[in-house]
Regions:
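Active-site flanking residues adjacent to catalytic metal/cofactor-binding acidic residues
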Residues: 66-67, 99-100, 178, 231, ...
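N-terminal active-site segment of His-dependent metallophosphoesterases
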Residues: 42-114, 205, 209, 217, ...
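Non-catalytic terminal accessory segments
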Residues: 9-12, 17, 26-31, 291-292, ...
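Residue-level marker for buried hydrophobic side chains located in beta-strands
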Residues: 62-64, 95-97, 134, 229, ...
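Cleavable N-terminal signal peptides of Sec/SRP-targeted secreted and luminal proteins
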Residues: 20, 29-44
């Protein structure tokens, strides 16, 4: 059954879909919906699409956290506790993870106890019992990538949804989830002592070409008021990792051409808000889920740099047709930085 669900990911006929759905029904009931959406999306669109639930007040509320999976250490548990408090207060619809979900080397398989020790047991509060939509980070690629991508993990925790690249469709807002690790040259040319799992990525050039085409096509076809792109790696950042030149070269032109509102990432272990003077895109880092305090802050144009905090924290957001309200929270629960973006004044920033 494991091989059936994991390996047969791209059916060529609806008969094979029906067969796989029947097999998926033998799993725990809580995983069936995810399995169905996973299979259906893979067979009907280039960029897999997941609908977000409609809300009565016409808004979507969510949290974003990255670089977290350390079995509760390095203040991960404190961040999780504050996320639970904020999540319950906001009655969030879902959580987004910007990657590096399990340190230091991803998961070893679907039975790896780190999944429970670093995810299920840590984010256990009632305010966080919503879907978690996750992208992969470079540390996740050091383990068994297929384990994190497997829908069998949803049998252990029905919140878990992780794919390479996919689309979350909330109608007036869409999230374009991008697998950024394969873009970075050094993981291929200078991996050091790390071993990366490139199954499903090679040949690399073809993988990157297809991913860029899928994201570009999805953005062009989008009629959403808000277009938000999620990836692990920084594009603009004053943190330790700084600018990722490969994304600046290949992904940014697509973001700018398609009027993307925000790019949200992890990778740098901080919370950070930059507004590009060239495009007006908001580059938001939420990578403070656990280990932080790198002590590296590079010089940056003060007109672009709206906020930088070299510590742990997470992002909250509430989005309507007209406005996006965003806040960074720290481990004490205090609001570190808040801002609004309105659509009446395209991408104009109001700092609270």
């Amino acid at each position: 059954l494991n091989q059936l669900v994991i390996k047969m990911r791209f059916p060529s006929t609806f008969m094979s879909i029906a067969f796989r759905i029947r097999a998926a029904m033998e799993l725990h009931q809580s995983t069936f919906l995810f399995c169905f959406l996973f299979l259906f999306a893979a067979s009907t669109a280039d960029l897999q699409r997941f609908p977000l639930p409609a809300t009565s007040d016409g808004s979507l509320a969510f949290l974003v956290v990255g670089d977290w999976g350390r079995k509760g250490l390095y203040n991960q548990s404190l961040v999780a506790a504050q996320m639970g408090t904020v999540g319950e207060k906001m009655n969030i619809n879902f959580v987004i993870s910007t990657g590096d979900n399990f340190y230091e080397d991803g998961l070893t398989g679907v039975e790896d106890p780190d999944f429970g020790d670093s995810f299920s047991d840590i984010y256990a509060s009632s305010g966080l019992q919503k879907r978690w939509y996750s992208v992969l980070g470079n540390h996740d690629y050091r383990g068994d990538v297929e384990a994190q991508l497997s829908p069998l993990l949803a049998e252990k925790d029905s919140r878990w949804v992780c794919l390479r690249s996919f689309l979350l469709d909330g109608g007036f807002v869409q999230f374009f989830m991008v697998d950024t690790t394969p873009f970075v040259d050094k993981y291929f040319t200078k991996p050091g002592h790390s071993t990366y799992d490139w199954n499903g990525v090679l040949p690399r050039d073809e993988y990157l070409k297809n991913q860029l085409q899928e994201v570009d096509t999805a953005l062009k076809q989008s009629t959403a008021t808000w277009k938000i792109v999620i990836g692990h790696h920084t594009i603009l950042s004053a943190g330790q990792h700084g600018v990722t030149k490969e994304l600046l070269e290949h992904l940014v032109p697509i973001l700018e051409e398609n009027n993307v509102d925000m790019y949200i990432n992890g990778h740098d272990h901080c919370v950070q808000h930059i507004v590009s003077s060239a495009s007006g895109i908001h580059y938001v880092t939420s990578g403070g889920g656990s280990k932080a305090w790198r002590g590296v802050i590079k010089e940056w144009n003060p007109e672009e740099m709206k906020y930088y905090y070299d510590g742990q924290g997470f992002l909250s957001a509430k989005v309507t047709e007209e406005k996006a309200n965003l806040m960074f929270y720290g481990v004490s629960g205090s609001v570190l930085h808040a801002w609004n973006i309105t659509k009446e004044n395209e991408r104009k920033v109001f700092i609270a």
